[in-house]
Amino acid sequence: MLADKVKLSAKDILEKEFKTGVRGYRQEDVDKFLDMIIKDYETFHQEIEELQQENLQLKKQLEEASKKQPVQSNTTNFDILKRLSNLEKHVFGSKLYDE
């Protein structure tokens, strides 16, 4: 998924060779900078993997919670009806249910 969008990997950066010219860049500076970029790429890659795993886990939890929710709702409705029935018996007496 992400590999399709990213053009360079940490390995590509590490293995990149630069041609030197008469007045080219200092090799040491280029290497240090590339090392920083490689570390950043590795950090970003690791963070992305962790976030994708967390995202997958949260989606599974959401799916499980949404499956359980209707059962809880039905139970709650049943409990409410039962309590209402008991209150009616108490308020109106048993005459309401004897008829």
Swiss-Prot record:
The keyword Coiled coil applies. Signal peptide: none annotated. Pfam families: DivIVA. The keyword Cytoplasm applies. Residues 34-71 form a coiled coil. InterPro entries: Cell_cycle_GpsB (IPR011229), DivIVA_domain (IPR019933), DivIVA_fam (IPR007793). Transmembrane segments: none annotated. It is found in: Cytoplasm. Its main location: cytoplasm. Forms polymers through the coiled coil domains. Interacts with PBP1, MreC and EzrA. Belongs to the GpsB family. This is Cell cycle protein GpsB. The lineage of its organism: Bacteria, Bacillati, Bacillota, Bacilli, Bacillales.
